Amino acid sequence: NSEYYSEKVGTLNVVNSNPTFSNFTYEDTNATTIKLTGGNQAIVKGYSNVKAIVSVANKAIAKNYASISKYRLVIGSKQLDINYSSDASVSGTINKVESNIFNMYAIDSRGNSTVKQISPNRYLDYSDIIIKQASVQRTGGVGSEVTLAFSGTYWGYGFGAMNNAITSCYYEYKTTTSDSWIKGGDLSVSLDGNNISFKGTIKGDIGANGFDIQKSFNIRVIVKDRLSQSIYTMTLGSGTPAIAITKKGISVNGMYKESLGGALQIWNGDVYIDGKKINFS
């Protein structure tokens, strides 16, 4: 009897070998957002921490003699690998999620995968409060009276258990040479839809009279809602005028002091007439 042998070279493709995987659950674990929404199923963009859970009942099952190696949770641009277990629930958490699409991949030892996609019951497209523009000005460009103005936006909607709100707004100041901030006072913000604004005179280092004209200051506004805050810092220059003209007289290099009187007051400088220094002492 004769025997015949034939050799074939090729690639064997195993089909229908992706793991069986059909479900997982999630919950928010951020205590702050849970309090705002009233539960752990609503997700707040940028603040909720999403914990994804694969229970034993929902575990992935490999096919054709492969084994499950891991799960991979993907939310937006963030991802996390989670160890597989056949006899215990497994979970992983992605913090501060910015997408309402949660993808969980079950990956086997051959690299085959099956994805399950879910979305939260409620996804709140929250945006941080922000001061877009602000200014501080001395009245007339000189003097101690200072006006502060700013405008911005906030997320003016409800979370579920409570509505968003401006929780505080105040300003602080310091001289430009100092490192220590001083709280100036609270500010009453005007609301118009999602827009916020303020304009008014503010107290300073000389109380209700404002800010010392001989000094320059840093002034910053801090506004907060239930989740975020915005800080805007400005510089206030000194308020000493080169020339101050009043009904009672003229002052050079300073404000005219009515208590002193006189037609001409000169501060912090020498006086020259025809190139000659005048000595008043």
Give the role of each language-model region:
Residues 106-108, 221-225:
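Conserved structural position at the C-terminal beta-strand
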Residues 78-88, 185-201:
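Short beta-strand segments within Ig-like beta-sandwich modules, predominantly Fibronectin type-III
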Residues 90-100, 198-217:
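Surface-exposed, short loops/turns at beta-strand junctions within beta-sandwich domains
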Residues 15-45, 123-147:
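Short, compositionally biased P/S/T/A/G/V-rich stretches that sit at domain boundaries
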Residues 45-47, 83-85, 95-97, 124, ...:
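Surface-exposed coil/turn segments at beta-strand junctions on protein surfaces, enriched
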Residues 247-281:
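Intrinsic low-complexity, repeat-rich intrinsically disordered segments enriched
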Residues 42-74, 153-183:
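Solvent-exposed loop/turn segments flanking beta-strands in beta-repeat/beta-sandwich domains
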Residues 3-14, 82, 112-122, 228-242:
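Edge beta-strands of extracellular beta-sandwich domains
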